[in-house]
Amino acid sequence: MIKVGILGTGFGTTHLELYSKVDGFNIVSVFGRNEEKLKEIAEKYNVSATTNINEVINNPEVDLVDICLPTELHSKWAIEGLKRGKHIFCETPISCSVEEATAVQQAAEQYGKKVFVNLFIKFSTPHQYAIELAKKAELGGLLGIRSYNKTSSRWGNLGLQKNVESFHNHMMDFVVEIAGLPSSVTASGADYDDKSIVTSALNYDGLYAVLESNSCLPNCCPFEIGFELLFENGIARFDAIYHEEFEKEEFLVTANGKPREIVELDSKDEYEEVLKHILKCLKCDVKSDLIDIDNAIKGVKLKEMILKSLL
């Protein structure tokens, strides 16, 4: 049983629910600043709750510290947890800068503990399928990637910089898993206070990728995501619409000399799959090849490249 201490009661409450669905974890303690909310959490989940963050990271029972704090606090408390002999599971992004992320990486090596970052997009069924399709090269060489997401203001502030850091970044993790870091980036965008549109063109040798994040949709519109992978001998395309009243997902593969294939997608929850992956890595004492600090740093590097071009 992996014993967990959670820092933060914003997205941390979502993590609490997720842990309750995955066997092998036990929540020991939760830190937050809102005493009323902490009381509700303690009663609902039968856990210890505190406004003293050190009570969680110093707790000898805690094996894994789950960080759901504001991004600017991620690296600080990841390092503090590592110093105290804890493994770390951190919400994405791991840090605000490559320098901070590298400090976390060095601390993990120094103290001999594992760092996992919630790069959940890699466990999304359609994205997993696309990644495997690209790696197997069954449709020939990969020529281009296009990925998009669109939303209304339901996620709060997604102005230009916040868009790149908290919305655009999921697509970045997807593309980096397939193609690695680009040689250069050209980004453009339009900023409307707490809303924005960001388009990034990623340049590789013999490959292009275009990412677009739009947080300007009216509130009546559904959340949309999708991607298209262009191969020498075919195209793989996924489009999804998520609305309060309906959902629609479609994954099509079109290849030379073959009938169009509608891919049947498993209904796995990518967030639960992340926890199962972490559990396996900790039980087997192996490093993650998908969501470790090394993979997370690549995402932070790409974010800095995009922001440098954009701002």
Show where each model-derived region lies.
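Hydrophobic residues in well-ordered beta-strands that form the structural core
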Residues: 51, 90, 115-117, 238
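Beta-loop-alpha module in the N-terminal Rossmann-like domain of NAD(P)-dependent dehydrogenases
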Residues: 15, 45-105
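N-terminal Rossmann-like dinucleotide-binding module
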Residues: 1-45, 279
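A short helix->loop->beta-strand "cap" motif at the edges of active sites that frequently abuts
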Residues: 47, 84-86, 111-113, 206-207
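C-terminal helix-rich "cap/oligomerization" subdomain common to oxidoreductases
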Residues: 55, 64-69, 110-113, 263, ...
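Short polybasic amphipathic segments
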Residues: 227-229, 244-257
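A contiguous active-site-proximal alpha/beta segment in oxidoreductase catalytic domains
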Residues: 95-155
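Contiguous beta-strand/loop segments that form the cofactor/metal-binding neighborhood of enzyme cores
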Residues: 166-244, 275-285
